[in-house]
A protein has these predicted regions:
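Cell-envelope/glycan interface and biosynthesis
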Residues: 1-86, 94-107, 111-138
Length: 139
């Protein structure tokens, strides 16, 4: 049983043992708190301490470390085009932003379809591609 409270969809959820556990550990499983109180101006939504969203591993850890909302994370990936990230287990990832019709990155020697973790559609004809890295890439 995940919840001991009668109604988890209330502001007080963040103060329950379950709410605290989710807040502190959800990123390890690919989830983020969707609407953070300090991000209301960015998301347009008030804090919802019960509203967790699956964004995947390693994205949730990266977003949590950098205190990024989903909107900020997507914009960051779009600006950077590619980031490299090592998670708390020592797994290394390359995360790319790709637009339909711009497949240069897929032709690049860096991209390896055998190491593909996932492809997430983030908008019309926009994608985030995540792949594992070998240790040798950083050596």
């Amino acid at each position: 049983e995940l919840l001991n409270t009668a109604d988890p969809l209330v502001e007080e959820f963040k103060n329950t043992p379950e709410g605290q556990w989710l807040y502190n550990n959800s990123w390890k499983y690919g989830f983020v708190l969707r609407y953070l109180p300090e991000k209301k101006d960015i998301t347009g939504i008030i804090s919802e301490p019960w509203h967790f969203r699956y964004v995947g591993i390693p994205h949730a850890e990266y977003m949590t470390e950098k205190n990024l909302s989903v909107e900020e994370y997507i914009n960051y990936i779009k600006e950077e085009k590619m980031i490299i990230f090592e998670d708390f287990n020592g797994n290394k990832y390359q995360i790319y932003y790709v637009q339909k019709g711009n497949h240069d990155i897929l032709q690049d020697d860096v991209f390896d379809s055998e190491k593909l973790v996932n492809v997430s559609e983030i908008g019309e004809d926009e994608y985030i591609i995540t792949q594992m890295m070998d240790e040798s890439i950083n050596d």
